[in-house]
Amino acid sequence: MNALNQKSPLILLISIILIAIGVVWLFFGTTQASGIDNQQVTDMLGRIVEIPSETNKVASISASTTVELFMLAPEKMIGWNEKRTSEENVYMKSTYSGLPVIGGGKKDANYENIISMNPDIVLIGHGGTDNQVDQIQSKFGSIPTLDVEGDNNLTSIKPSLEFLGKVLGKKEQSDKLISFYNDITKEVNSTVSTIPESERKKVYYARDSTGLMTNPPGSTHTQLIEICGGKNVVEAPLTKGSVGVSMELILQWNPDVIITSNQQFYDNIYFNSLWADVKAVKEKQVYMVPTSPFNWFEGPPGANTIIGIPWTAKVLYPDKFQDMDINKITKEFYTEYYHYNLSDQEATNILSSSGLKNT
């Protein structure tokens, strides 16, 4: 009887330990089996958000973060913000171009549709204030939302790529893209920084079919002009959107180069008598921005315009960038970041269609 009494505390202790082990195993075993394995991250507004340790399905409700998502992890995308055109899809694999339209941007997101697709996280580009992003979070319920800053500004884009590389588990890909950006920016800047102010090209960017909608200096939509050593001729205050100008003003500014993203304007400008006396038209210095799979110049401003740096440099100063192999650069960029292997002929077609004479 005494021996039994002496063993009772030991038996009780062992029983408690076994029960505790069972509870711990049950909790963690169930958690792993259910795929619940979370981590805390601090988004780019400083919000602490709990997200899955591994993200496999990602939604984006901003065009610029959607582009970054595609460049870093296309296999994780659940869809596009809006319907893509056949022209935009020329140089995109059908695997990606065929993804569904999930609906809208920050102001008109189709929350019900996105929630039904059960993404692991939702990306919000340049979301504004904590309160504004929290309001979006409340509409997504338990699906975590992350704010990404600098995604729509080429001069401050690197932190956004670093952040997404970490969140998406694509650090190697984001590091590679940042390295590409650094190298091409350094190459272009080392040349254009030596150009005297008096010799810098005057540039006008035409946004629409009339050519009379544009963006002033300081706009993210025209920042490639300044990055590549040009001078934006528009004399208008910086606004959030585009601005309308008159033909009289354009004749007064008399740009050396005109760049446009509008195919109709590009096709017609040399036959339009209103533009005939503009220096860029007289000297055949009008260029059409490549737009497949994304615009090289803007629309949206962001990571897609990295390839626009060497292109704009060649457009503005072809004599100073004779040794830059834009064909090779284009093929590399498309392979690595647009996941499409351009043939030599396709690269040539893209560049010659833009108006570049010597590629």
Report the location of each language-model feature.
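Extracytoplasmic ligand-binding site segments that recognize negatively charged/polar headgroups
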Residues: 87-88, 129-133, 148-163, 196-223
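Structured C-terminal subdomain patch of bacterial secreted/periplasmic proteins
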Residues: 155-166, 175, 266-359
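Structural recognition of the beta-strand scaffold that forms the well-ordered cores
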Residues: 59-61, 78-81, 101, 121-125, ...
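A contiguous binding-surface segment within folded domains or other stable secondary-structure elements
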Residues: 235-288
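Short helix-initiation/N-cap motifs at beta->coil->alpha
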Residues: 44-46, 99-112, 238-247
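Bacterial Sec-exported substrate-binding components of ABC uptake systems
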Residues: 2-67, 172-205, 315, 321-359
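Alpha-helical, coiled-coil/dimerization segments enriched in small aliphatic residues
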Residues: 104-106, 214-241
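A short, structured surface patch at a secondary-structure boundary
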Residues: 59-117, 121-128, 230-233
